[in-house]
Amino acid sequence: GVLTVFGEGEITDFAAGEAPWYAERGAVRKLVVESGVTSVGIGAFSGCGLIETVTLPLTLGRIGDGAFDDVYALKNIYYAGSIAQWKAIDIGLGNSFGSAKLVCADKTEPFSDISGWYHDYIITCYMADIVNGRPDGTFCPEQNVTRAQFVMMLYNMGGRPEISDTFLGFDDANAVSAVYAAAVKWGVKAGIITGFTDNTFRPNAEISRAQMATFAYRFLKLGVSADVLGGLSGRNDFRDYGSIAECYRESVDVMANIGVIQGYPNGSFVPNATATRGQSAAVLSRLLAALTELRT
């Protein structure tokens, strides 16, 4: 069924299970919020897990914390404005938007150079505040990514949590730019970063595809139980599997088995090749979707 919410002003905040439409949540597959509504309150549609599509108006300026919490079936969000206008909406924490596809009525692109295969992945990551573009309006999808830059993307994906002062301990800690310092400290504390055997992190070195898979896998482990992860292992069939260093194989196996990383058309993974911004966006977009699926 379709639930239509109309009127002027705010949809009020609701405690769990107290919204008037909550009792009918099992029948609602589509939600339409009509023009005039300016805010969706805290917990408004929380628990309406079978909603698959949501239509939102240009008048909307705020979505409260948990307004769409546990809306696990959500596939599509239709918004009356542009991507830039969507980004301006104050969206609170705990909303199940991670793997949903955003469709904007205004097709204006946020970047001028993303017409390739990576387009949708970049848009997904941009909408989730994982990546940003350049001041000139480009994204530079073919540009290589450094280790510090990829950790920054994961830090953004994790919500940029506040981090107490953490001693990095790497011999090259002074090479970590202030721009990436909080992200790298978070990465160390979360166990995503371990560094090399010579006790360096090498923040400005370009990240390899195998390293990217490993960092992504460690991020996945923060949000998915060990029991679930245990069922995802198993050697993959990349034709160049033998060239994957032993320390990266578990990560590559799991990430490939759940579709977060993919190989090239010839069946190879090329673990030592440098990852680009477009490839990084693809991996992180798929990781968002995997986290949503594996947590449900």
Language-model regions: role of each:
Residues 2-9, 26-39, 49-62, 72-88, ...:
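Structural signature of tandem-repeat unit edges
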Residues 17, 41-47, 62-72, 205-206, ...:
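Repeated polar recognition positions within modular binding domains
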Residues 12-24, 85-97:
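Acidic/polar low-complexity surface segments
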Residues 106-117, 132-182, 190-210, 218-248, ...:
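Feature responds to low-complexity, polar/acidic, surface-exposed segments characteristic
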Residues 32, 93, 97-106:
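Extracellular, surface-exposed repeat architectures
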Residues 123-131:
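Mature N-terminal segment immediately following signal peptide/propeptide cleavage
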Residues 21, 41-44, 64-67, 156, ...:
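Consensus positions within tandem repeat domains that build extended binding/scaffold surfaces
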